[in-house]
Swiss-Prot record:
<protein>
    <recommendedName>
        <fullName>Ureidoacrylate amidohydrolase RutB</fullName>
        <ecNumber>3.5.1.110</ecNumber>
    </recommendedName>
</protein>
<dbReference type="InterPro" id="IPR050272">
    <property type="entry name" value="Isochorismatase-like_hydrls"/>
</dbReference>
<comment type="similarity">
    <text>Belongs to the isochorismatase family. RutB subfamily.</text>
</comment>
<dbReference type="InterPro" id="IPR019916">
    <property type="entry name" value="RutB"/>
</dbReference>
<dbReference type="GO" id="GO:0006212">
    <property type="term" value="P:uracil catabolic process"/>
</dbReference>
<dbReference type="GO" id="GO:0019740">
    <property type="term" value="P:nitrogen utilization"/>
</dbReference>
<dbReference type="GO" id="GO:0016811">
    <property type="term" value="F:hydrolase activity, acting on carbon-nitrogen (but not peptide) bonds, in linear amides"/>
</dbReference>
<feature type="active site" description="Nucleophile">
    <location>
        <position position="180"/>
    </location>
</feature>
<dbReference type="InterPro" id="IPR036380">
    <property type="entry name" value="Isochorismatase-like_sf"/>
</dbReference>
<dbReference type="InterPro" id="IPR000868">
    <property type="entry name" value="Isochorismatase-like_dom"/>
</dbReference>
<dbReference type="Pfam" id="PF00857">
    <property type="entry name" value="Isochorismatase"/>
</dbReference>
<feature type="active site" description="Proton acceptor">
    <location>
        <position position="38"/>
    </location>
</feature>
<keyword id="KW-0378">Hydrolase</keyword>
<comment type="function">
    <text>Hydrolyzes ureidoacrylate to form aminoacrylate and carbamate. The carbamate hydrolyzes spontaneously, thereby releasing one of the nitrogen atoms of the pyrimidine ring as ammonia and one of its carbon atoms as CO2.</text>
</comment>
<feature type="active site">
    <location>
        <position position="147"/>
    </location>
</feature>
C-alpha cells in the first residue's frame, strides 16, 4: 500500500498519490511546486555553453517535450511553476573571482578563459545563452528566478517563496540532473522539503552513468524518482482524494 508522506494530511486539501521510487508519495498539488531547472539555450541547445564546453546535448529535445507536458499538467492542477535561470552579470562579478571555488570549477568560466572570444556570451544575463529555450515559456502566475550557483536555494528567495505559500513538496525537472537539479533537491531536503525528480524530464551533464548515479543518490538518500506519464496520471481528476 502506498505510504503517505509525513505531512500528507496537514492541509485538508485534495491529495493525490504519485507512484515513485523507492515508494509512493502523497501530496496536495496546490501546496506543491513544479521546478524547472535551467532550461536555457546554454544547457539544451547546440551552440550553447554545454555544447561549446564539450558536453553532449544531442538528446535534450525529448526532455524539452516532456517538461512541456509536465508543466501543462501541473498548471492545470494548480501547482506553482518556478523557472530557474543560471548565470551572472555581463562582467561576471556574480560568478566570483579567484577567491571563489566557482571561479575554478565552473566549466562555463573555464571555457571562456580558454576561448576569450566567448567572454560575455556564456551564461551572461541578457544573452541568447541565458535565455530559456523557445519551447518553454513562463506564463502569468509563474515565478522566474535567477540563480548564481548550482543550488536554487543559494542567494535566491526560493525558500521564502515556498514557505509563504505553505509549499512542502517540490517536483523537479531540468538540466543538469547531476549538477543543478540534484544540488537544489539536496538543499531542499536539508530544509525539510520533499523532493521528487521526474527522470525523463531531466538530462545529465556528462556520460549516461552520471544520470544514473544522480537518480540513485536521490531515490536512496534525498528524495523520490518518478516519470512524466506517472506524474500526469497522478494529477488527473480521478486520482484525487479529499483528506479532512
Amino acid at each position: 500500500m502506498p505510504r503517505p508522506s509525513p505531512c500528507a494530511d496537514s492541509g485538508g486539501g485534495m491529495m493525490t498519490t504519485l507512484t515513485a521510487r523507492p515508494e509512493a508519495i502523497t501530496f496536495d498539488p496546490q501546496q506543491s511546486a513544479l521546478i524547472v531547472v535551467d532550461m536555457q539555450n546554454a544547457y539544451a541547445t547546440p551552440g550553447g555553453y554545454l555544447d561549446l564546453a564539450g558536453f553532449d546535448v544531442s538528446t535534450t529535445r525529448p526532455v524539452i517535450a516532456n517538461i512541456q507536458t509536465a508543466v501543462t499538467a501541473a498548471r492545470a492542477a494548480g501547482m506553482l511553476i518556478i523557472w530557474f535561470q543560471n548565470g551572472w552579470d555581463e562582467q561576471y562579478v556574480e560568478a566570483g573571482g579567484p577567491g571563489s571555488p566557482n571561479f575554478h570549477k565552473s566549466n562555463a568560466l573555464k571555457t571562456m578563459r580558454k576561448q576569450p572570444q566567448l567572454q560575455g556570451k556564456l551564461l551572461a544575463k541578457g544573452s541568447w545563452d541565458y535565455q530559456l529555450v523557445d519551447e518553454l515559456v513562463p506564463q502569468p502566475g509563474d515565478i522566474v528566478l535567477p540563480k548564481p550557483r548550482y543550488s536554487g536555494f543559494f542567494n535566491t528567495p526560493l525558500d521564502s517563496i515556498l514557505r509563504s505559500r505553505g509549499i512542502r513538496h517540490l517536483v523537479f525537472t531540468g538540466i543538469a540532473t547531476n549538477v543543478c537539479v540534484e544540488s537544489t533537491l539536496r538543499d531542499g531536503f536539508f530544509l525539510e522539503y520533499f523532493g521528487v525528480v521526474l527522470e525523463d524530464a531531466t538530462h545529465q551533464a556528462g556520460p549516461e552513468f552520471a544520470q544514473k548515479a544522480a537518480l540513485f543518490n536521490i531515490e536512496t538518500f534525498f528524495g523520490w524518482v518518478s516519470d512524466v506519464e506517472t506524474f500526469c496520471d497522478a494529477l488527473s481528476p480521478t486520482s484525487f482524494a479529499r483528506i479532512a
